[in-house]
Design a protein with these regions (language model features):
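Short, charged beta-turn/beta-strand-edge "cap" motif at the junction between a beta-strand
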Residues: 106-107, 116-136
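Short nucleic-acid-contacting surface segments enriched for D/E, G, S/T with interspersed K/R
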Residues: 96-116
Length: 136
């Protein structure tokens, strides 16, 4: 930690902005650490997909002084029913995910389901892909 004008500045910090439910202290610590999470952006290719049975999610606000470009960014962590963590910074993925998650939680809270995560070519940016998900 660096000090400046007698205040402590953190070079790296993670704050939980929101979560799908109230978290215990242990869960708060565990979910803020996404270093051991499966990175959706890196583990999906244009040719395959991944199935996740979501149980919870956490939205994290990250500050990283050493980041190239934007030092403040958001990470979305999805926790599956087996306790595995998946992380992405993709707004398009999380927008679709939260629509599915909230609808299922409200209209069918006891129904088990999975989401299929996949990459799609961007229509707006040639040669670029984005990740999204669908209910299966």
């Amino acid at each position: 930690m660096a000090t400046k004008n007698n205040t402590v500045e953190k070079e790296y910090s993670v704050i939980i902005r929101n979560s799908s439910r109230e978290l215990s202290a242990k869960e708060k610590i565990a979910f803020r650490d996404f270093g051991n999470a499966i990175k959706l952006d890196e583990n999906l290719s244009d040719d395959d997909s991944m199935l996740i049975a979501p149980a919870d999610y956490v939205i994290l606000d990250v500050h990283n002084e050493k980041a190239k470009g934007n030092k403040d960014y958001t990470k979305y962590v999805i926790i599956d029913t087996a306790g595995n963590k998946y992380v992405t910074g993709s707004e398009s993925f999380f927008t679709r995910f939260i629509e599915i998650f909230e609808t299922m939680a409200e209209d069918a809270p006891d129904e088990e389901y999975q989401i299929e995560c996949y990459k799609k070519p961007s229509k707006n940016y040639a040669g670029k892909s984005f990740i999204s998900c669908s209910l299966v």
